[in-house]
Structure formats: structure tokens, C-alpha cells
UniProtKB/Swiss-Prot annotation:
Residues recorded as bearing Phosphothreonine in the entry: T29
Disease: Meier-Gorlin syndrome 4: A syndrome characterized by bilateral microtia, aplasia/hypoplasia of the patellae, and severe intrauterine and postnatal growth retardation with short stature and poor weight gain. Additional clinical findings include anomalies of cranial sutures, microcephaly, apparently low-set and simple ears, microstomia, full lips, highly arched or cleft palate, micrognathia, genitourinary tract anomalies, and various skeletal anomalies.
PTMs per UniProt: Two independent E3 ubiquitin ligase complexes, SCF(SKP2) and the DCX(DTL) complex, mediated CDT1 degradation in S phase. Ubiquitinated by the DCX(DTL) complex, in response to DNA damage, leading to its degradation. Ubiquitination by the DCX(DTL) complex is necessary to ensure proper cell cycle regulation and is PCNA-dependent: interacts with PCNA via its PIP-box, while the presence of the containing the 'K+4' motif in the PIP box, recruit the DCX(DTL) complex, leading to its degradation. Phosphorylation by cyclin A-dependent kinases at Thr-29 targets CDT1 for ubiquitynation by SCF(SKP2) E3 ubiquitin ligase and subsequent degradation. Phosphorylated at Thr-29 by MAPK8/JNK1, which blocks replication licensing in response to stress. Binding to GMNN is not affected by phosphorylation.
Matching InterPro entries: Cdt1 (IPR045173), Cdt1_C (IPR032054), Cdt1_C_WH_dom_sf (IPR038090), CDT1_Gemini-bd-like (IPR014939), WH_DNA-bd_sf (IPR036390)
Biased composition (Basic and acidic residues): 1-11, 155-164
Comment block on domains: The PIP-box K+4 motif mediates both the interaction with PCNA and the recruitment of the DCX(DTL) complex: while the PIP-box interacts with PCNA, the presence of the K+4 submotif, recruits the DCX(DTL) complex, leading to its ubiquitination.
Residues the record lists as Phosphoserine modifications: S31, S93, S318, S380, S394
Gene: CDT1
Protein name according to UniProt: DNA replication factor Cdt1
Effect seen on changing Y170A: Alters interaction with GMNN
GO biological process entries: attachment of mitotic spindle microtubules to kinetochore; cell division; DNA replication checkpoint signaling; DNA replication preinitiation complex assembly; mitotic cell cycle; negative regulation of cell cycle; negative regulation of DNA-templated DNA replication; positive regulation of chromatin binding
Region (Interaction with LRWD1): 451-546
Keyword Hydrolase recorded: no
């Protein structure tokens, strides 16, 4: 069935006898100046578009076109929107279709003139509408240009930002990213300081409520754990600048710290909250309501600090502006809140300057209560003798190793039979040793402590080499074995320093060999250990007398 329909379709499309199209008045696009007349399609053409044959010779007058074209003069075409000629028609817009009825064959001429008048009036109305639209477009362009010119001076009047290093964007534009309506927003660094005050007040309140002295070391550790941010004394100084009536700061000693690195005799910065006395005379407590009240006071003082900078900014404008502070609800649009300078930290109490001993005379004056009266007398005579020069040109003589003999004194019964000279020499050496201990530097004291441990470490090191059955060991292995075998608790790094000192004092017994990136220790196991121990003891006594 479908195949037959397709066959019928193609059969109908075949060219047949010539068909004459009935005359009709179709609305077409305006034809050229001299349009050709439509004629019946050729019988030989199979195309849908039919050519227009020339007019039949038997006709006396050509058939009029279906639509007439409006012809304008040269002056009218060049200026179609001139306001001085409102009656001149213009070409209609492409989107509008103007229907014109053409006179058919045998139509009276007065009907044709009436239709032409209607077409002209339509074109005039279209022209008037186009003029109105053009005037509106020109007015909008002029208003937009005026608005752009008015915005230019504001942009030129803004101060240029410095070319130096800028803060991160989340700090410079922190005020713009706050939710809600714009108001008296604090800068980012001021909000961080307010958070530090809240954390500090919380830690101080906990310590104060349980009758524990709040120190800066305790508060610093707690605030850094809460904020995950560094908290230094300069931040405490800024808090004191903003809210001076919040705490009382003092430098105190003998404060228990429960910390290994701090001694009780050291001065520490204590922080005491200033609270109002209770009505019943009880000790004031830093409760949650007081914490909230102090936090609000601190935030209000920060806002007042920013208002001062805002007031100075308003005074620098041209013309200057004056806004009452109680009526201020938001900052000036050109006031950069996040560029407000930091708060200057206030001075905190510092520990008193302790007296430092720099000369032996000061050490002796300080240590008079540590020595016996006879030794004090001998040292004073020695100081007088050394102070008086033997000759004007000769330099001062060095301190003799043995002080001069003192007048004989009654010896106790336990020292009967002992030479007085021997006793004097012993006492002189003891005084010299005490003097060396009082004037010894920390590095030398640490070296002496290591020298005292060396005899025991030498025995342990020889046992390690004997058990390992190797002529040489790496420094890491030797230190690890020594740490596990020694009775004194030391780290591998400290043990390595002892081995270096041992190789420095006894290079013929213990030698170090650096191979590439490792250091190897080689020990002479055939050497006499007693002789090695005696040499170390002698070296220790020699350095103790210095």
C-alpha cells in the first residue's frame, strides 16, 4: 500500500500539460523600478519556479504591478529623519508589512488615489515613531556619559596604596567579608587581640579561682593551646594598653612553677585580675558573668580605639566631616578598616637587675662567710701584698701558688705531731681550690664533670670492645652500647662528647677515624687499664687546680 502511494506521488510530479495559474493579488516584496509582468509557466519546465515570459503582443496596455514602490527624491533620501520636513514619508522598517491594494483591471482611478493616501499616512506615523525612539536612545546615551564622568573624580581622589609588602587578602578585606549589614566592624588584628584577651581571661580565672598564682609562663602555654597561635609579652602589653584596669602585673620570686627549666629563685611575671570586692567580704571570684562583662568592655574599648583613627580620617577629607560618636553606626566607605595601625604595647614590670661578679676581689668579698677567719686573714694579706708593686717600672707579680706562712697558732690536739708548714700548705691549696670554684666559668665546670666520669667510661668502653670482638666500631654503635652499659643516664649525643674528650686526652689509646660520612672508634685493647685510669685522674686534678 505504501509503495503504491510513493509511486503515485512521483507520477504526479511528472511534467504534464501546461497549467495556467489564476490571477491573484499576492503581497510581495517591492519589485524593481520596472517590474515584469507575471505569465503562465512554460509547459516544458519541470521546476516549481516559473519564469516570466514577455508580455503578449496582442495586449495594448501592460498589466499594473501587484504593489507600488514609493520613490523618494535625493534630498529626502539623504535626510529622512530631518525634523523640518515632518510630512515626507520614509521607508517602512523591514519588520512591518504594509499592505497596499492595487487597482485591478477596470478599477476606477479615484479608489487608487485613496489607497495611496492611506499608505502615505501610515508611513508618516512610522517615521514619527522612529524619530521618538531615536530621541530616547540619544537621551539615554547622554545620561550614561554624565554618570561615567561623575565617577571619574572619585576614583582619581582616592589615595594610592603603598607599594610595599601587603598583608594577606583575608586580612586586608576581612571587614568586607563579615555577614550581615555593614557596621562598626573591627580590623582582623584587633579581633585576634580580642580573642587573645578572652583566652587569657579564661586561663587567669581558672588559676585565680583555685587560689593559684597566675604567671605568664602558665598563661602563655594555655593561651597557645587554645588559639593555636603564638602569645608573647608584647600581646600582654597591648592588652594592658587597651584595658589597663583589667590586671595588675608584678615581678615575684619563690613562685611554684612545677617546671624543670624554671627555679623558684627566678623572677616571674605574675598576673592578678582586678575585681570588685564582694558584698559579704568574701574573696572575689572570676565567674562566667564577670568574664562576659570584661570581654564586652574590652571589645568596646577596641571600637573606641578604631573610632579615633576614623575621626582623624574624617578630618583629613576635603571638606572635613564631623560625625558624633554616639550617632556613628558604620565606617566611612573610603575608610580602610583593616589598615588601622597596631596598638602600641605598654611597658610591663621587668625583673630587678642582679649584681654580677666580674673580679676576684668581688668574689672574695661575697664569699667571706664561706671561709675560716685564718684563711680570710691570709687572703687579705695576699691581696695587700699583690696590690703594692715592688718597683715603679716592673709589672705586678702574679699570684704565688703558695701564700706566705701565717703566725703560728695553737693547733688542736688531733693535729699534734703534724708539721705546721704542712698544715699551711694544705690550707693554702684548699683556699686556692675554693677560689677557683667560685670564679670558674660554666664551660670549664662542665668539662670537669666530664673528666670525673672518664675513668668509669674508659672501663666500660674497653668491655664493649672486648665483647664485640672487633678492632673498630662506628660512633653510633659505640655510643649505643655505652648508653646501655653505663650506670649514669646519658643521651647518645652526650656520650659522643665524652668519647671525643677521651680521644683528645688519650690519643694513643683511643683514636677516631673519619671515613666518608661515618666516624669509627679504634681502641688499643693491649694497653694497661690501670695506667689509663691513673692518667685520667691526674688530668682531672690538674684542671681542678686551674
Amino acid at each position: 500500500m505504501e509503495q503504491r502511494r510513493v509511486t503515485d506521488f512521483f507520477a504526479r510530479r511528472r511534467p504534464g500539460p501546461p497549467r495556467i495559474a489564476p490571477p491573484k493579488l499576492a503581497c510581495r516584496t517591492p519589485s524593481p523600478a520596472r517590474p515584469a509582468l507575471r505569465a503562465p509557466a512554460s509547459a516544458t519546465s519541470g521546476s516549481r519556479k516559473r519564469a516570466r515570459p514577455p508580455a503578449a503582443p496582442g495586449r495594448d496596455q501592460a498589466r499594473p504591478p501587484a504593489r507600488r514602490r514609493l520613490r523618494l527624491s535625493v534630498d529626502e533620501v539623504s535626510s529622512p529623519s530631518t525634523p523640518e520636513a515632518p510630512d515626507i514619508p520614509a521607508c517602512p522598517s523591514p519588520g512591518q508589512k504594509i499592505k497596499k491594494s492595487t487597482p485591478a483591471a477596470g478599477q476606477p482611478p479615484h479608489l487608487t488615489s485613496a489607497q495611496d493616501q492611506d499608505t502615505i499616512s501610515e508611513l508618516a506615523s512610522c517615521l514619527q515613531r522612529a524619530r521618538e525612539l531615536g530621541a530616547r536612545v540619544r537621551a539615554l546615551k547622554a545620561s550614561a556619559q554624565d554618570a561615567g564622568e561623575s565617577c571619574t573624580p572619585e576614583a582619581e581622589g582616592r589615595p594610592e596604596e603603598p607599594c610595599g609588602e601587603k598583608a594577606p587578602a583575608y586580612q586586608r578585606f576581612h571587614a568586607l567579608a563579615q555577614p550581615g549589614l555593614p557596621g562598626l566592624v573591627l580590623p582582623y588584628k584587633y579581633q585576634v587581640l580580642a580573642e587573645m584577651f578572652r583566652s587569657m581571661d579564661t586561663i587567669v580565672g581558672m588559676l585565680h579561682n583555685r587560689s593559684e598564682t597566675p604567671t605568664f609562663a602558665k598563661v602563655q602555654r594555655g593561651v597557645q593551646d587554645m588559639m593555636r597561635r603564638r602569645f608573647e609579652e608584647c600581646n600582654v602589653g597591648q592588652i594592658k594598653t587597651v584595658y589597663p584596669a583589667s590586671y595588675r602585673f608584678r615581678q615575684e620570686r619563690s613562685v611554684p612553677t612545677f617546671k624543670d627549666g624554671t627555679r623558684r629563685s627566678d623572677y616571674q611575671l605574675t598576673i592578678e585580675p582586678l575585681l570588685e570586692q564582694e558584698a559579704d567580704g568574701a574573696a572575689p571570684q572570676l565567674t562566667a558573668s564577670r568574664l562576659l562583662q570584661r570581654r564586652q568592655i574590652f571589645s568596646q574599648k577596641l571600637v573606641e580605639h578604631v573610632k579615633e583613627h576614623h575621626k582623624a580620617f574624617l578630618a583629613s577629607l576635603s571638606p572635613a566631616m564631623v560625625v558624633p560618636e554616639d550617632q556613628l553606626t558604620r565606617w566611612h566607605p573610603r575608610f580602610n578598616v583593616d589598615e588601622v595601625p597596631d596598638i602600641e604595647p605598654a611597658a610591663l614590670p621587668q625583673p630587678p637587675a642582679t649584681e654580677k661578679l666580674t673580679t676576684a676581689q668581688e668574689v672574695l668579698a661575697r664569699a667571706r662567710n664561706l671561709i675560716s677567719p685564718r684563711m680570710e686573714k691570709a687572703l687579705s694579706q695576699l691581696a695587700l701584698r699583690s696590690a703594692a708593686p715592688s718597683s715603679p717600672g716592673s709589672p705586678r707579680p702574679a699570684l704565688p701558688a703558695t701564700p706566705p706562712a701565717t703566725p703560728p697558732a695553737a693547733s688542736p690536739s688531733a693535729l699534734k705531731g703534724v708539721s705546721q708548714d704542712l698544715l699551711e700548705r694544705i690550707r693554702a691549696k684548699e683556699a686556692q681550690k675554693q677560689l677557683a670554684q667560685m670564679t670558674r666559668c660554666p664551660e670549664q665546670e662542665q668539662r670537669l664533670q666530664r673528666l670525673e666520669r672518664l675513668p668509669e667510661l674508659a672501663r666500660v668502653l674497653r668491655s664493649v670492645f672486648v665483647s664485640e670482638r672487633k678492632p673498630a666500631l662506628s660512633m653510633e654503635v659505640a655510643c649505643a652500647r655505652m648508653v646501655g652499659s653505663c650506670c649514669t643516664i646519658m643521651s647518645p649525643g652526650e656520650m659522643e662528647k665524652h668519647l671525643l674528650l677521651l680521644s683528645e686526652l688519650l690519643p694513643d689509646w683511643l683514636s677516631l677515624h673519619r671515613i666518608r660520612t661515618d666516624t669509627y672508634v679504634k681502641l688499643d685493647k693491649a694497653a694497661d687499664l690501670a695506667h689509663i685510669t691513673a692518667r685520667l685522674a691526674h688530668q682531672t686534678r690538674a684542671e681542678e687546680g686551674l
